[in-house]
Amino acid sequence: MVPTGQVAEKQACEEPRQDRELKSWRCLVFYLCFFGFMAQLRPGESFITPYLLQQNFTIEQVTNEIIPVLPYSHLAVLVPIFLLTDYLRYKPILILQCLSFMCVWLLLLLGTSVVHMQLMEVFYSVTMAARIAYSSYIFSLVRPSRYQRMASYSRAAVLLGVFTSSVLGQVLWPLEQKSQNSNMLNYISLGFIIFSLGLSLFLKRPKHSLFFNRSALVHKALPCELDQMHPGPGRPEPGKLERVLGSCRNSFLVCMLSELVGNLRQPQLRLWCLWWVFNSAGYYLIVYYVHVLWSIDKNLNYNGAVDAASTLLSAITSFSAGFVKIRWALWSKLVIASVIAIQAGLVFCMYMVHYVTWVHKIWVLYMTYVLFRGAYQFLVPIATFQIASSLSKELCALVFGINTFLATALKTAITLVVSDKRGLGLKVEKQFCIYSVYFMVLSVICFVGAVLDGVRYCRRGRHQPLPLPQELSPLENSVQVPSMQDGGLGGLQPSAPQLLPEDGVEDSEASLRAEAKA
């Protein structure tokens, strides 16, 4: 037994250390949240398209030559940024993001040709790919027990930053028009970006990351090493090539991929991954081109207010999704089909409004976009939960990275065919007609799948118990879901993902945790 005096002395030594750790953690949380808030303050972002049209770029140039560069370059930089984020341990990528934003606004201020604006889109694609660094970085500095709180704080900071930026832009836009200074919003945005760059230089760089700089590797002899130490009778000593192949087969990434292939047999995982890929591609095409669609009324511009309203509604719908409690094994496809059908109807309204004269077109476009974005954000935390509920933290990062890449590839292919002048080069109104058909086809496919699931359940599934209804609660899920079997990952426990999809305001594991916390 330990003497009482030694126990008291040990506790007395631990208390100051715990106090210092708590104080350090609070300071770190505040600084990260402040950086996340300031990094979103770009009041000119909602008005980039009107600014380009004021600089004598035509709608055709913006639609068919400038904007299509964004998905192309995003696809090109996505994988390198994804890997470098982990290899360089996050902080350098956050600095790169700020530098890329500086290049974006410098090109907006100084550029005069289509080539300059296309280069601006290339730098903007780097900032989009680099958003993954912030969402991963915040979880590498704290203990797992603090993940949920960190996620809620950081997510709230980002949402508040986007909302504030949109409102500020809307307030300053009329002043810019009256002052005849078309660059005022761009200069203010550049100032905020430079300040964010200064903040990023003082961020603490973590010692470990998810894949390349792991903190707790399983140190065990590989099969080829065991064969070399104790070769069997009559077996030749393995050569260099065989040892290299053995190391590759037993590498962490290969083990993760083999584990992922096994997990893809789960119907719910496949379903929500497919939703992520196909719906995200259509969603971001709408986001890219909706500002061009709004340019039909040059005398009325409430882009900032609409972005603020859509951000607020997205936060509300994402939060409300946390209270949905149904049997997802039975109703997932029906829920997805219903939401996508709503999206299809809203996009079709955006298209049809150009052919009617009895409504104020711009207000209908504003309202349908706000509702469209809110509908998409309703399913994001549900999809995040369904994907994360049976995967480890590392596998979640890999799955979301693959989903984002596939969605970007699909988005790029559609852009090449529909928008690019080397393809069909359609006007923006015709593009929205095609996008509405795209969403309608997805909805019909999901409805058919839901009907087939219902028929199977009625015929032979009544005696088979379905999984109980689940709320979107990662804390409960971490207790209910059993740990993964030994498949090369050392029995990693399921956890929510660290890496996010491309939209820094939206698709994230952090939003799931924040909403569950709320």
From Swiss-Prot:
Organism of this sequence: Cricetulus griseus (Chinese hamster)
Residues found modified as Phosphoserine: S473, S478, S483
The entry's keywords: Acetylation, Antiport, Cell membrane, Folate-binding, Glycoprotein, Membrane, Phosphoprotein, Transmembrane, Transmembrane helix, Transport
Extracellular-facing ranges: 51-62, 111-114, 177-181, 293-300, 351-353, 416-423
Gene Ontology BP, a term: folate import across plasma membrane
Subcellular localization: Cell membrane; Apical cell membrane; Basolateral cell membrane
Source species, domain of life: Eukaryota
SUPFAM superfamilies per the UniProt record, alphabetical: MFS general substrate transporter (SSF103473)
Modified positions (N-acetylmethionine) in chain numbering: M1
Keyword Transmembrane tagged: yes
Cytoplasmic side: 1-29, 86-89, 138-151, 201-266, 324-329, 378-391, 449-512
Function: Antiporter that mediates the import of reduced folates, driven by the export of organic anions. Also acts as an importer of immunoreactive cyclic dinucleotides, but with a lower transporter activity. Mechanistically, acts as a secondary active transporter, which exports intracellular organic anions down their concentration gradients to facilitate the uptake of its substrates. Has high affinity for N5-methyltetrahydrofolate, the predominant circulating form of folate. Also mediates the import of antifolate drug methotrexate.
Binding residues annotated for folate, in chain numbering: I48, T49, E121, R131, V162, A281, G282, I286, Y366, V370
Positions glycosylated per UniProt: N56
Protein topology in the membrane: Multi-pass membrane protein
InterPro entries membership: Folate_carrier (IPR002666), MFS_trans_sf (IPR036259), SLC19A1 (IPR028339)
Gene3D superfamilies associated with the record: MFS general substrate transporter like domains
GO function terms (MF aspect): 2',3'-cyclic GMP-AMP binding; antiporter activity; cyclic-GMP-AMP transmembrane transporter activity; folate:monoatomic anion antiporter activity; folic acid binding; methotrexate transmembrane transporter activity
Catalytic activity of the protein: 5-amino-1-(5-phospho-beta-D-ribosyl)imidazole-4-carboxamide(in) + (6S)-5-methyl-5,6,7,8-tetrahydrofolate(out) = 5-amino-1-(5-phospho-beta-D-ribosyl)imidazole-4-carboxamide(out) + (6S)-5-methyl-5,6,7,8-tetrahydrofolate(in)
Pfam families reported in the protein's UniProt record: Folate_carrier
Chain positions covered by the region annotation Required for substrate-binding: 407-419
Gene encoding the protein: SLC19A1
Residue ranges crossing the lipid bilayer per the database entry: 30-50, 63-85, 90-110, 115-137, 152-176, 182-200, 267-292, 301-323, 330-350, 354-377, 392-415, 424-448
Family: Belongs to the reduced folate carrier (RFC) transporter (TC 2.A.48) family.
Disordered, as annotated region: 480-518
GO CC list: apical plasma membrane; basolateral plasma membrane
Protein name: Reduced folate transporter
